[in-house]
């Protein structure tokens, strides 16, 4: 991933789970590689990942996540966890779009590494970002102001205090039981 040349990558209708957070980052494109676009649609990421997206390409790239569910990710408490999204080697000409996604259990409460489970660690996001109609629940460090580049900058968020009441999250069934949350139609559509 340090010298790869990628054009357009699409991940659609996938479930990716149980990737040990101690083993590394989720989508990992290091400096020296090239990417035109990464589009992730209607997919679920569950249990694992240190930094979820580590995109350090230096060229202009477009990255988007649409209707995805993130469950129990970025929970490793060490200095290698830079939160959910990292695009720190590019410029403001690059784009990161996160739309209609559901986030549950991102990070941990009171971590030693204050960047664990944040949206983007300070200084680790240079792309222009767009966050639209996302839903967050039980993400205690997501908008931590001490080491996050963003502090609750989500102005278009549904009721983040309503428990989604997953049917059986421990077994991988993230079907939403709470009708109020289900009606929001955010996250991977297979679950609502």
Where are these regions (language model features)?
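Extracellular beta-rich repeat passengers
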Residues: 1-173, 188-190
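Active-site and glycan-interaction determinants of carbohydrate-active enzymes
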Residues: 176-192
């Amino acid at each position: 991933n340090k010298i790869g040349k990628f054009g357009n990558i699409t991940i659609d209708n996938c479930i990716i789970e149980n990737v040990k957070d101690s083993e590394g980052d989720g989508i990992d494109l290091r400096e020296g590689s090239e990417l035109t676009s990464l589009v992730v649609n209607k997919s679920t990421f569950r249990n694992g990942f240190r930094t979820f997206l580590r995109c350090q390409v230096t060229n202009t790239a477009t990255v988007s996540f649409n209707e995805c569910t993130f469950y129990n990710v970025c929970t490793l408490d060490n200095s290698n966890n830079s939160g959910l999204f990292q695009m720190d080697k590019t410029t403001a000409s690059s784009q990161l779009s996160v739309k209609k996604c559901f986030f549950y259990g991102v990070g941990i409460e009171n971590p030693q590494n204050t960047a664990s489970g944040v949206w983007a660690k300070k200084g680790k996001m240079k792309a222009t970002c767009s966050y639209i109609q996302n839903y967050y629940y039980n993400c205690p460090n997501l908008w931590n102001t001490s080491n996050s580049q963003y502090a609750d900058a989500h102005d278009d968020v549904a009721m983040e205090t309503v428990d989604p009441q997953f049917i059986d999250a421990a077994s991988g069934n993230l079907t939403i039981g709470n009708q109020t949350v289900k009606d929001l139609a955010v996250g991977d559509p297979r679950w609502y």
